[in-house]
């Protein structure tokens, strides 16, 4: 059970600004369709004009807060409608495959959001309502984000495999990738359908070149991103934040070599589509020397949730196993009998773990334990865990850290690329009909 980065962001700022929280996708009921226009049909569901108006108002609120110039109204509406279509297609797939978010999981996520912002639940609710976001809407938004996160984990992240040969090749051919240098980037993505015709491709290339020409003439990057980009971060100016070189797709890593802060790349082509990258800033770059890190020897029992085993039942099952360990049962033997992880054959033994080797939820819980202690059940993107810490040590892990960093970088690269491909394939097989008149 090694690290695949968790995709669930803590979205308090987004919710407070009515910015990026996701609206719940419900099948439209007949009465609402009768009194509202239909903006689009997605498979067997509709997106109403009211939903689209809400999303437009939300985006305008966000752009104003960020001080980002607004794109033309028709462009903004078209961009947001396409995002609603893609979001609805994902949520339909989640429902069809019985993915759910139970109340206990939702309450824990909201508690973490409040805690990370040093608020009580009551203070969080008051802050949201002061800014015009109802508590029920906020809860629905968080539930939707968790659901989309779990869908990505199941369909993409959990299927990513990085081999030792790939790690060796990465280290041999990317000598400067682990130097510690970081880049602050923004980007524009124009998705290209998998089976795009020559005419479609020409139109998309023309769209990318138009965006580039606007940038060359001095137009604001955030405004152009909001007008042209198909990426989820388009309404945030296309901001990717700070990324180390090893976390960048090879296409971006090569492009930033030629850029100085403030400059913009030419139009780039990848399997996901067409890209324009802006280098906002760069920092760091000193190579890391020998590292002594505290490592933890741990075991765990993993219970995965499924259509027939929900979160509450998985947690309850682990509580029962924990009680047996406290009463003298062998953790290793229980792991062999009950754990769904590959480590079960070794009694749940994960070996010596360095910081960053496991997902944050697991690591935080493990770090709070003393040798010999057993945790309460904890949830991660992989399922529910019971963790036992056996020992700790200081270890020179310079070479091991390089390999782990390379493996994590490759995993994130492959996951991001696979997710973009998966989204494109999902969109291509989704029936979509756009409506412009009243229905």
UniProtKB/Swiss-Prot annotation:
One of its GO terms (molecular function) is unfolded protein binding. SUPFAM superfamilies: FKBP-like, Triger factor/SurA peptide-binding domain-like. One of its GO terms (cellular component) is outer membrane-bounded periplasmic space. Pfam families: Rotamase (PF00639), Rotamase_3 (PF13616), SurA_N (PF09312). One of its GO terms (biological process) is Gram-negative-bacterium-type cell outer membrane assembly. Its EC number is 5.2.1.8. Its main location: periplasm. Keywords: Chaperone, Isomerase, Periplasm, Repeat, Rotamase, Signal. It is an enzyme of class 5 (isomerase). InterPro entries: OMP_Chaperone_SurA (IPR050280), PPIase_dom_sf (IPR046357), PPIase_PpiC (IPR000297), PPIase_PpiC_CS (IPR023058), PPIase_SurA (IPR023034), SurA_N (IPR015391), Trigger_fact/SurA_dom_sf (IPR027304). The PPIase activity resides only in the second parvulin domain. The N-terminal region and the C-terminal tail are necessary and sufficient for the chaperone activity of SurA. The PPIase activity is dispensable for SurA to function as a chaperone. The N-terminal region and the C-terminal tail are also required for porin recognition. Chaperone involved in the correct folding and assembly of outer membrane proteins. Recognizes specific patterns of aromatic residues and the orientation of their side chains, which are found more frequently in integral outer membrane proteins. May act in both early periplasmic and late outer membrane-associated steps of protein maturation. This is Chaperone SurA. It comes from Aromatoleum aromaticum (strain DSM 19018 / LMG 30748 / EbN1) (Azoarcus sp. (strain EbN1)).
């Amino acid at each position: 059970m090694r690290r695949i980065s968790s995709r669930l962001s803590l979205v308090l700022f987004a919710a407070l600004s009515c910015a990026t929280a996701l609206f719940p996708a419900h099948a439209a009921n007949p009465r609402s369709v009768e009194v509202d226009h239909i903006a689009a049909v997605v498979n067997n569901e509709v997106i109403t004009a009211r939903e689209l108006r809400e999303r437009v108002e939300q985006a305008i609120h966000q752009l104003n807060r960020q001080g980002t110039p607004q794109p033309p109204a028709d462009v903004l509406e078209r961009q947001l409608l396409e995002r609603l279509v893609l979001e609805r297609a994902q949520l339909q797939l989640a429902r069809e495959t019985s993915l759910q978010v139970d109340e206990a999981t939702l309450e824990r996520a909201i508690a973490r959001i409040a805690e990370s912002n040093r608020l009580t639940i009551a203070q969080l609710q008051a802050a949201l309502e002061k800014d015009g976001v109802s508590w029920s809407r906020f809860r629905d938004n968080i539930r939707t984000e968790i659901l989309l996160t779990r869908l990505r984990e199941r369909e993409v992240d959990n299927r990513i495999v990085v081999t030792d040969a790939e790690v060796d090749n990465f280290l041999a051919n990317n000598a400067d990738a682990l130097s510690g240098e970081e880049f602050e980037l923004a980007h524009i993505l124009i998705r290209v359908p998998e089976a795009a015709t020559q005419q479609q491709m020409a139109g998309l290339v023309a769209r990318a070149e138009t965006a580039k020409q606007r940038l060359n003439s001095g137009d604001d990057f955030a405004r152009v991103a909001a007008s042209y980009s198909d990426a989820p971060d388009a309404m945030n100016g296309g901001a990717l934040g700070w990324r180390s070189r090893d976390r960048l797709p090879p296409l971006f890593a090569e492009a930033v070599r030629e850029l100085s802060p403030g400059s913009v790349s030419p139009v780039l082509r990848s399997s996901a589509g067409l890209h324009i990258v802006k280098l906002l800033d760069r920092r760091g770059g000193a190579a890391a020397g020998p590292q002594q890190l505290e490592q933890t020897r741990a075991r765990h029992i993993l219970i995965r949730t499924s259509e027939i085993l929900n979160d509450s039942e998985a947690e309850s099952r682990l509580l029962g196993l924990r009680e047996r360990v406290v009463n003298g049962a062998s953790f290793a033997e229980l792991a062999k009998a009950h754990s769904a992880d590959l480590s079960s054959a070794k009694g749940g033994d994960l070996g010596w773990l360095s910081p960053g080797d496991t997902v944050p939820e697991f690591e935080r819980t493990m770090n709070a334990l003393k040798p010999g202690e057993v945790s309460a059940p904890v949830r991660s993107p992989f399922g529910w865990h019971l963790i036992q810490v056996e020992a700790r040590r200081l270890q020179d892990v310079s070479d091991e850290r390089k390999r782990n960093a390379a493996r994590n970088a490759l995993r994130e690269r492959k996951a991001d690329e696979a997710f973009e491909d998966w989204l494109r394939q999902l969109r291509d097989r989704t029936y979509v009909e756009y409506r412009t008149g009243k229905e």
